[in-house]
Amino acid sequence: MIEAQATSTIDIRPFESLGHANHGWLNARHHFSFAGYGDPSRMGWGALRVWNDDRIAPQTGFPPHPHADMEIITYVRTGAISHKDSLGNSGRTEAGDVQVMSAGTGIQHAEYNMEQEETALFQIWIIPDVRGGEPSWGTRRFPEQAGDGWTVFASGMDGDVEALPIRASARVLGARLKAGDSIDYALGEGRHGYLVPATGTVEIDNRRVNARDGVALRGGDYRITALEDAELVLVDSL
């Protein structure tokens, strides 16, 4: 369960309520307004601007396209995604791993599913604290075992030295829970949290939250309890 102080808020956004676009090669769900999906009440949450739940068919993907002034974090759920950009970077990020692109003054990149199976991923966009800066890209493998608490994948916060760096006062975290296990998170005053169970079901404030639902949170102390084995992804931002 997520238990909150009285001053905090919890807004559950069921998967079926999310924006939806099926392009054949790409089946996407949008937690916030994106491309052809527009909802004035879902333009972002704090500095979190985009959370796309993408399923990409084998041997397809996104051809070269530009980005600027955005921190783009990709969490691969199943399969793998292959990246190539105008800086000369290239790499393959597998399930459970994370890649980060700081678009800065501008970068072109392509992302393809070169596998023989569907790739599922979360792509998360966070608004940087300051515009501009030199663009960059990086990827990292993270531990997959349950019960080790939160792992900080990407962060611009002091002390998160093992995380991939981003240029925002934000962090992207993950955790794996066994059924019946709980995990706590303290969301600072004035901060915004957005939680998605990538897999499994959790209980939030005595309400059930299913896999791929979104949960918008305000500052408070929270406890998350898994009703079944679960994989969690959380963004903490201003």
Name each model feature, range by range.
Residues M1-L238:
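Jelly-roll (double-stranded beta-helix
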